[in-house]
């Protein structure tokens, strides 16, 4: 029995990388289909192989996983966020952050297209970035001379996934990190202010001393798969202050003595973050019940 990490999934086949660096192509045994458990890119698995044919026998316990895209055991998720063209969208960034917090994946915010900003716009984005840094998130700017080196150092020895608003420059950033990737960059539609989807499959690619995934289906989050009562768990600044709310289980909406609303009133918590919280609360309340299945 051998052990390795799945680095590619394509049409029912799984390419597994061994500790030696060798790659073995395998398929999943029928038992996985019966149990509705599917191997994911990033999974550590036990498998057997003979005559260039292999079969996966067991999937190791996952540290975390994402559904869109299907990938497991991610160390860092780089959120490529456009500062302009398309305009910065705080609600979308917050949605991505909440989804990553819920999945127990460490986010890193990368502001792209900083060179397109006027001075006043630059100051505004700096103010926004300072707030996200103050609540514990790592932030990198595309116009920093040391940006790429800083990003490479943070990705070293880690598995990372790149995500972001369509047209934000995700593939452009990946091509800067590793020109040999040769990823197609989609032009932004001026009519829709959205980019063309150009990525087709989930693959982990070795870049220097990191494993990087460029993946499809990461332009938005349609649902949050957790109870509405857990929403404030995924806003770090809320976790710190909610203990001062008058009522235990405060939802930070209409309750008197809410420490979160008081913090918003004095500017300790930004209005945009609170607006995102309220929008996500309504989104979760409006969602139809979802029955979980194993992944």
Swiss-Prot record:
<keyword id="KW-0342">GTP-binding</keyword>
<protein>
    <recommendedName>
        <fullName>Small ribosomal subunit biogenesis GTPase RsgA</fullName>
        <ecNumber>3.6.1.-</ecNumber>
    </recommendedName>
</protein>
<dbReference type="InterPro" id="IPR010914">
    <property type="entry name" value="RsgA_GTPase_dom"/>
</dbReference>
<dbReference type="GO" id="GO:0005737">
    <property type="term" value="C:cytoplasm"/>
</dbReference>
<feature type="binding site">
    <location>
        <position position="245"/>
    </location>
    <ligand>
        <name>Zn(2+)</name>
    </ligand>
</feature>
<keyword id="KW-0699">rRNA-binding</keyword>
<keyword id="KW-0963">Cytoplasm</keyword>
<comment type="function">
    <text>One of several proteins that assist in the late maturation steps of the functional core of the 30S ribosomal subunit. Helps release RbfA from mature subunits. May play a role in the assembly of ribosomal proteins into the subunit. Circularly permuted GTPase that catalyzes slow GTP hydrolysis, GTPase activity is stimulated by the 30S ribosomal subunit.</text>
</comment>
<dbReference type="InterPro" id="IPR030378">
    <property type="entry name" value="G_CP_dom"/>
</dbReference>
<dbReference type="InterPro" id="IPR012340">
    <property type="entry name" value="NA-bd_OB-fold"/>
</dbReference>
<dbReference type="GO" id="GO:0042274">
    <property type="term" value="P:ribosomal small subunit biogenesis"/>
</dbReference>
<feature type="binding site">
    <location>
        <position position="252"/>
    </location>
    <ligand>
        <name>Zn(2+)</name>
    </ligand>
</feature>
<keyword id="KW-0694">RNA-binding</keyword>
<dbReference type="GO" id="GO:0046872">
    <property type="term" value="F:metal ion binding"/>
</dbReference>
<dbReference type="GO" id="GO:0005525">
    <property type="term" value="F:GTP binding"/>
</dbReference>
<dbReference type="InterPro" id="IPR031944">
    <property type="entry name" value="RsgA_N"/>
</dbReference>
<dbReference type="InterPro" id="IPR027417">
    <property type="entry name" value="P-loop_NTPase"/>
</dbReference>
<comment type="subunit">
    <text>Monomer. Associates with 30S ribosomal subunit, binds 16S rRNA.</text>
</comment>
<dbReference type="Pfam" id="PF03193">
    <property type="entry name" value="RsgA_GTPase"/>
</dbReference>
<dbReference type="GO" id="GO:0003924">
    <property type="term" value="F:GTPase activity"/>
</dbReference>
<dbReference type="InterPro" id="IPR004881">
    <property type="entry name" value="Ribosome_biogen_GTPase_RsgA"/>
</dbReference>
<feature type="domain" description="CP-type G">
    <location>
        <begin position="63"/>
        <end position="221"/>
    </location>
</feature>
<feature type="binding site">
    <location>
        <begin position="112"/>
        <end position="115"/>
    </location>
    <ligand>
        <name>GTP</name>
    </ligand>
</feature>
<dbReference type="Pfam" id="PF16745">
    <property type="entry name" value="RsgA_N"/>
</dbReference>
<feature type="binding site">
    <location>
        <begin position="164"/>
        <end position="172"/>
    </location>
    <ligand>
        <name>GTP</name>
    </ligand>
</feature>
<keyword id="KW-0547">Nucleotide-binding</keyword>
<feature type="binding site">
    <location>
        <position position="250"/>
    </location>
    <ligand>
        <name>Zn(2+)</name>
    </ligand>
</feature>
<keyword id="KW-0862">Zinc</keyword>
<keyword id="KW-0378">Hydrolase</keyword>
<feature type="binding site">
    <location>
        <position position="258"/>
    </location>
    <ligand>
        <name>Zn(2+)</name>
    </ligand>
</feature>
<keyword id="KW-0690">Ribosome biogenesis</keyword>
<keyword id="KW-0479">Metal-binding</keyword>
<comment type="similarity">
    <text>Belongs to the TRAFAC class YlqF/YawG GTPase family. RsgA subfamily.</text>
</comment>
<dbReference type="GO" id="GO:0019843">
    <property type="term" value="F:rRNA binding"/>
</dbReference>
């Amino acid at each position: 029995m051998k052990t390795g990490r799945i680095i590619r999934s394509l049409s029912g086949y799984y390419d597994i990388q061994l500790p030696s660096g060798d790659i073995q192509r395998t398929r999943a045994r029928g038992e996985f289909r019966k149990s509705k458990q599917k191997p994911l890119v990033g999974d550590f698995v036990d498998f057997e192989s003979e005559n260039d044919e292999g079969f996966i026998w067991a999937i190791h316990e996952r540290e975390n996983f994402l559904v869109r895209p299907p990938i497991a055991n991610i160390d860092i998720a780089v959120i490529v966020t456009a500062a302009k063209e398309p305009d910065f969208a705080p609600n979308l960034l917050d949605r991505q952050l909440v989804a990553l917090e819920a999945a127990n994946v460490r986010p890193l915010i990368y502001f792209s297209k900083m060179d397109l900003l006027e001075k006043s716009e630059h100051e505004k984005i700096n103010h926004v970035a300072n707030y996200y840094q103050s609540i514990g998130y790592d932030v990198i700017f595309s116009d920093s001379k040391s940006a790429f080196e800083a990003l490479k150092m943070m990705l070293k020895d880690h598995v990372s996934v790149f995500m972001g608003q369509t047209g934000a420059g995700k593939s452009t950033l990946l091509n800067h990190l590793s020109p040999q990737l040769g990823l197609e960059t989609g032009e932004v539609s001026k009519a829709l202010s959205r980019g063309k989807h150009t990525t087709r499959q989930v693959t982990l690619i070795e870049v220097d001393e990191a494993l990087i995934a460029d993946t499809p289906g990461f332009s938005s989050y349609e649902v949050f798969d957790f109870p509405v009562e857990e929403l404030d768990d995924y806003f770090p600044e809320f976790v710190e202050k909610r203990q001062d709310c008058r009522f235990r289980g405060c939802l930070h909406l209409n309750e008197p003595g809410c420490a979160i609303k008081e913090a918003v009133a004095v500017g300790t918590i930004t209005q945009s973050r609170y607006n995102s919280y309220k929008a996500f609360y309504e989104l979760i309340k409006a969602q139809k019940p979802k029955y979980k299945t194993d992944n």
